[in-house]
């Protein structure tokens, strides 16, 4: 993830394309509230602005809020459903919240009670400065997108429903808070560094397990764990039936070069046979989403390092695959899945709209008449359809009793793939997408595991992945 930790000052007065309207606000005694004179308001009204944008100028009050056609647009760095108050990104780290939010809102005279136009939630990072940086970068991008939309349509998007805010207003009222932050965040890192001086550093090592699920009645602790090959780990399982046997396609990550390949495991009579690597590129591959259509077998592995979404076709099952189509190019995408419904193809993928490389927060949906198209269209309701690190990132797809279920990864504070949710897709069309959470799975079904983020199933077999912390990858 790229974080803009260095801020660059720009002198706007040197920009000849900008016009300036100088106004001087009046601060309250507390230096928190800012109001403008009637003369200033009259000048602003005369200028006929579409909207005004507040950039950290204190809390605005009075007629300034009504002086432009569409009002005043403002950032709020924080999820106002969870916490209120600043500094940006601080309280989520201190309180170990799994996600950190921002809203872009139209201001009114009620503190934190503006009309929410855009809301986003990102995985909380481990340190305040990085968490703050990602919130600023992501919200900045979506503010620009909002302003472009306002410029084109000359109206604000539909705001969220009215919500009452009863949560605590946080303030740093003493140095005790900062000592608590240092104790919680720096001390554990210092201790881990000391251990790393005498022991190999801790790594997260994923594994895969499988079982005949018996109509999804078998408990996950009964699933058979497949030992990892030496110096590697297996993750992102996808189950596929071919003939009378089931196969599990997995990410096969080699620690020796920090790169994933796609490998396959044959399951027959509940016994496994590791068949080895079946697809490798000169960039990382993972998440081997496999499916069939018109008697052909296809795979869309994640190829985010190559900035594209690729469709491979099977020439000889299970070990011979060729690149068939580039579905999208020049895109920062992860964990792509497709399926055919109501005579259309739908793509669910995790795209980072900004330059952060964050694939945890945004779920995008695209539609196409043809599978082998490089002109997939976003659904008309707009992307992302979900903007929340607790619900967005794909972890699998399966079908049961005519219902399509999407697995999503659930991330904790600085904890990728902590658990996963199971969601029933209620509506998907070229115009809308909706789903509802039906279950959550926590990482407690195998001894010593700390994470689980992928699940796949057909009518016969199911597979799940999970991770443990280890101080050696050579085993």
What label would you give each PLM region?
Residues 1-285, 289-298, 310-314, 325, ...:
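One-carbon transfer enzymes
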Residues 223-224, 274-279, 322-328, 376-384, ...:
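Beta-propeller fold detector
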Residues 250-252, 301-302, 349-351, 408-410, ...:
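Recurrent small/Gly-Pro-centered beta-turn motifs in extracellular repeat architectures
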Residues 253-257, 304-307, 352-356, 411-415:
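Short glycine/acidic-enriched loop and turn motifs that connect beta-strands
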Residues 314-318, 368-374, 424-435:
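Short loop/turn segments immediately following beta-strands, especially the blade-tip
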Residues 380-398, 429-455:
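Conserved blade-ending motifs and adjacent loop-strand segments that build the rim/top face
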Residues 386-419:
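Repeat-solenoid scaffold signature
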Residues 418-428, 435, 445-475:
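Blade-level signature of beta-propeller repeat domains, shared across WD40, Kelch, NHL, RCC1
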């Amino acid at each position: 993830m790229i974080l803009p930790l260095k801020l660059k000052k720009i002198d706007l007065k040197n920009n000849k394309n900008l016009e300036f309207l100088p106004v001087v606000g009046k601060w309250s005694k507390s230096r928190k509230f800012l109001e403008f004179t009637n003369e200033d308001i009259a000048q602003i009204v005369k200028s006929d602005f579409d909207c005004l944008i507040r950039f950290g100028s204190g809390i605005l009050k009075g007629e300034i809020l009504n002086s432009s056609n569409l009002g005043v647009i403002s950032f709020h760095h924080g999820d106002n459903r969870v916490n209120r108050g600043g500094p940006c990104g601080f309280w989520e780290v201190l309180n170990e919240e799994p996600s950190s939010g921002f809203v872009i809102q139209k201001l009114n005279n009620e503190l934190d009670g503006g009309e929410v136009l855009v809301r986003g939630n990102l995985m909380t990072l481990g340190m305040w400065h990085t968490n703050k940086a990602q919130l600023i970068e992501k919200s900045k991008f979506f503010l620009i997108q909002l302003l472009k939309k306002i410029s084109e349509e000359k109206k604000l998007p539909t705001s969220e429903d009215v919500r009452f805010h009863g949560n605590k207003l946080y303030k740093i009222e003493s140095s005790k808070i900062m000592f608590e932050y240092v104790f919680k965040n720096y001390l554990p890192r210092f201790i881990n560094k000391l251990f790393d001086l005498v022991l190999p550093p801790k790594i997260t090592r994923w594994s895969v397990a499988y079982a005949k699920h018996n109509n999804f009645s078998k408990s996950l602790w009964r699933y058979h764990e497949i030992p990892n090959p030496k110096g590697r780990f297996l993750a992102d399982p996808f189950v596929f039936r071919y003939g009378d046997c089931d196969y599990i396609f997995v990410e096969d990550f080699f620690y020796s070069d920090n790169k994933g390949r796609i490998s396959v495991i044959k399951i027959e009579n509940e016994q496994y046979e590791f068949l080895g690597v079946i697809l490798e590129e000169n960039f990382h591959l993972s998440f081997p989403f496999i499916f069939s259509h018109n008697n052909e077998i296809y795979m869309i592995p994640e190829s985010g390092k190559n900035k594209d979404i690729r469709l491979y076709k099977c020439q000889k099952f299970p070990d011979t695959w060729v690149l068939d189509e580039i579905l999208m190019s020049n895109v920062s995408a992860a964990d792509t899945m497709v399926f055919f419904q109501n005579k259309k193809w739908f793509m669910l993928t995790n795209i980072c709209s900004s330059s952060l490389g964050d694939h945890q927060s945004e779920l995008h949906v695209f539609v196409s008449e043809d599978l082998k198209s490089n002109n997939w269209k976003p659904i008309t309701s707009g992307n992302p359809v979900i903007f929340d690190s607790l619900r967005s990132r794909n972890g699998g797809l399966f079908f049961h009793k005519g219902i399509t279920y999407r697995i999503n990864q659930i991330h904790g504070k600085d904890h990728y793939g902590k658990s996963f949710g199971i969601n029933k897709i209620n509506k998907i069309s070229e115009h809308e997408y909706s789903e509802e959470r039906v279950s959550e799975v926590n990482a407690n079904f195998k001894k010593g595991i700390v994470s689980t983020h992928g699940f796949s199933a057909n009518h016969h077999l199911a597979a799940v992945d999970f991770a443990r912390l280890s101080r050696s990858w050579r085993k």
